[in-house]
């Protein structure tokens, strides 16, 4: 589960339009906007290096931040988009949405797999095929999980892992209302070839 909410520093951006945004970039900032929460949008500047470091850590769009802006009350936000330079792939603008801890939000949560060494199907040479490396969940803003965990213990060749097989955090609900596939364990190619030959002989 998500732990302590990290702080994110920003400054109020004076001026509007492309000119102010370009000036911010020249001074080492990434222009951004904070919206929602029943308040007027707030134009901000985010330190470029801070944003880049956060992006490199991963799960930036799945992280709830405590936004600290001088002269403003601290507010919980979540990133709703990062625009990037089409050539350099570096951030040029960032959007944040204000949230309450009890707000509900849809997020893609990463799926991890554990106990590979306890899966007989993998020991026999089977291959774990991941169909959905991320799952979109509706979650409470104050309880965003870091990831979902799939336990591979006792999994055999031919096993199919569905979303209903995963223990979801309390209050988390998949946005897709069906028991969709997360992953499966397929037979090694040699075993599949042998099975096909046997079927051909029987035919």
UniProtKB/Swiss-Prot annotation:
Pfam families xrefs: Ribosomal_L25p, Ribosomal_TL5_C
A GO molecular-function annotation: 5S rRNA binding
Keyword annotations of the record: Ribonucleoprotein, Ribosomal protein, RNA-binding, rRNA-binding
Gene3D superfamilies found in the cross-reference section: Ribosomal protein L25, beta domain, Ribosomal Protein L25, Chain P
Protein family: Belongs to the bacterial ribosomal protein bL25 family. CTC subfamily.
Matches recorded under NCBIfam families: bL25_bact_ctc, PRK05618.1-2, PRK05943.1
Protein name: Large ribosomal subunit protein bL25
Species whose genome carries this gene: Cereibacter sphaeroides (strain ATCC 17023 / DSM 158 / JCM 6121 / CCUG 31486 / LMG 2827 / NBRC 12203 / NCIMB 8253 / ATH 2.4.1.) (Rhodobacter sphaeroides)
